[in-house]
Curated annotation (Swiss-Prot):
GO terms for cellular component: cytosolic large ribosomal subunit. Residues 1-51 are annotated as: Disordered. This is Large ribosomal subunit protein uL15. GO terms for biological process: translation. Binds to the 23S rRNA.
Length: 185
């Protein structure tokens, strides 16, 4: 088997439907638009106007918003970590953010949260950004250690004074809002 012998799966690639190319094609003459009239002409769009009825976009209320500061968080259960340990994907007692990023291949997330679903039998030292209470308790009960990271890998790599491992664990500085003192009378 080599690269030249690879083919897409059956049914994965469809031919483009070419309309208006003769009656024998099945999509000729009217090109799938039916017979004459406004809907068969170019520029036709389905109307939003619903007559005197209140349109659907006004009937339904506005709901919520999308936060621009949202942190994409990848959640992992203890059962998943235990499976990785049993399969030999995790070797040793220490699991870093690098390991989590590598094991969750294709993950868009910058932050990792460990959840307490399942059991863990191995004593591990794990570094992640967030832990649920139950996950933290189960890891410590198994003889492990929980370390909270404060930064993403990208942020940590930009700090020049520290190694990436040290920078991950360094808390971010908090912005302190200063109150202006009133002018003296």
């Amino acid at each position: 088997m080599d690269l030249s012998s690879l083919r897409p799966a059956a049914g994965a690639v469809k031919n483009k439907k070419r309309v208006g190319r003769g009656q024998g094609s099945g999509n000729g003459t009217t090109a799938g638009k039916g017979n004459k009239g406004q809907q068969a002409r170019s520029g036709y769009q389905k109307p939003i106007n619903e007559g005197g009825q209140v349109p659907v976009y006004r009937r339904l209320p506005k709901f919520g918003f999308t936060s621009l500061q949202r942190k994409p968080i990848k959640t992992l259960n203890l059962s998943q970590l235990e499976d990785w340990i049993q399969d030999g994907l995790i070797t040793g007692e220490e699991i870093s953010v690098y390991d989590l990023k590598a094991l969750c291949s294709g993950s868009y997330a910058d932050y990792f949260k460990i959840l307490g679903n399942g059991e863990i039998t191995t004593a591990i030292k794990i570094t992640a950004h967030f832990f649920s209470k139950s996950a933290e308790e189960k890891i410590i009960k198994a003889g492990g250690q929980v370390i909270k990271a404060y930064r993403t890998l990208e942020e940590a790599s930009k700090i020049r004074d520290l190694s990436v491992e040290e920078a991950l664990l360094k808390p971010k500085a908090k912005l302190v809002k200063r109150v202006k003192k009133s002018a003296k009378p």
